[in-house]
Amino acid sequence: MKPENTKQSSFYKRLFALVLPMAAQNLLNALLSASDALMLGLLDQSSLSAVSLAAQVQFVFSLVMDAAIIGTTILAAQYWGKGDTRAVEKIQANTLRISCAVGAFFCIAALTVPQLLMRLFTPDEELIRLGASYLRIVSVSYLFGGFSQIMLCVMKNTGRTLRSTVYGASSVVLNAALNALLIFGLLGFPRLGIRGAAIATSIARFAEVLLVLYENRRFKEVRLRLTDIRHGDRDLFRQFRRHTAPVLANEMSWGLGVTMFSVIMGHLGSDAVAANAIGQIVKNIAACFCNGLGVGAGILVGNLLGAGKLDQAKEEGGRLVRVSAVSGIVSGIILLVCSPLVMRFAGHLTGEAQGYLRFMLYVCCYYMIGKSVNGTVIAGVFCAGGDTRFGLICDTVNMWCLIVPLGLLAAFVFKWSVPVVYFLLNLDEFTKMPAEWIHYHKYKWVRNLTNERGAEST
């Protein structure tokens, strides 16, 4: 076999060993959301709409957690590639101090002011009442998630991707099973409806915490130590803060923009809300491999950069861009083929909501291409080398200077139809591509961050 073919074979072997387990877990998570929607939809359309809007609180929480996870991946992948396991332990402890505080904040907010949170997304009193009851119960899951998600992230970055997937998948399966039992009152359990879905989520998150604590005792190379949590590492914290602050700002800027999408759709009627809820679930299912590819790209390139293999990282970054484009196209085609099947499962919606959903599914097909490429390049390749400021600038300008104003004008000034508004809101992944392409070829992301430790304080 030629050296070039051997190199490519090694690349794809390492890539798919990372991506396939994560894609499988993403798929399970998306299917869980789909099962939630299906079960709640069988109750009534109001329950489905209320939970989809209440889930925006979880979405904002996930934005903060995603920033912490990306920041952890940036450093953990590079230090693991270098072979410095003690640094990885300290990175894990530093991040947990932050993520657990974030989880506590969201828990308190969802527990004490759920009606206020719901009013941000809809004026409908019935949806506010139902959503508030859901938020009160699910609030404790933010505490558990703040801990378990960082632990699972470190597992992915330290050669335990498959085990991380098994733990995450176990939590998802438990959640789905409890949903069925508690929403409908099967096998002698009480019929709790929307409250049952919240209880199931909280129990599943707690089970996930127990699993990662077991893993912490089992795996000897990287352990969570109480001394690291109490004292921390100032140099690593400064390095984490430097590279994570732009990611957090980027996640919040982009995420609040996407939340504005829900606000806009929420004020266009319950039919638009219900169709958008199912459309978002289907979009998430279709993007499972694309999202896994983005995370895998960050780990793969980060390991190489940390090991000092800058030329190889640059070469494999190019391969990842090409793979991401193909991944997006294939995902879009699969979604197009499966669209009629999705419509059959949406028979409980009103006729108008079904019409909206049919159009939304077509939009999601081409959306996958931009989603895949941007997720791999901006959140994966760029972040692997600590090049996080570009994403902040690009997403903020794109979202708040173009897409959100365009959506607001279309919905509330020009009074355009729901399909037109939805189409405009889903241009965000494509309008930033030219700037992203130019920045990629500057190669500012080709950096070994482990050589910069200690320089943050100077």
Residue ranges and their predicted role:
Residues M1-V19, A76-S141, P190-A245, V301-Y367, ...:
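Short alpha-helical transmembrane segments in multi-pass integral membrane proteins
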Residues L48-I108, G145-S164, S262, A275-S339, ...:
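Small-residue-rich hydrophobic transmembrane alpha-helices
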Residues L27, L31-S49, M118-E125, L181-L192, ...:
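Helix-terminus/linker motif at the lipid-water interface of multi-pass membrane proteins
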Residues T6-L38, L42-L43, Q56-G71, L75, ...:
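N-terminal transmembrane alpha-helices
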Residues I69, V138-N157, S164-N175, A197-V212, ...:
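Short runs within selected transmembrane alpha-helices of multi-pass transporters and secretion channels
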Residues L40-F59, E125-L130, I194-R195, L236-H243, ...:
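Interfacial/gating helices of multi-pass transporter permease domains
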Residues A23, L27, L31, S35, ...:
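Generic alpha-helical transmembrane segments of integral inner-membrane proteins
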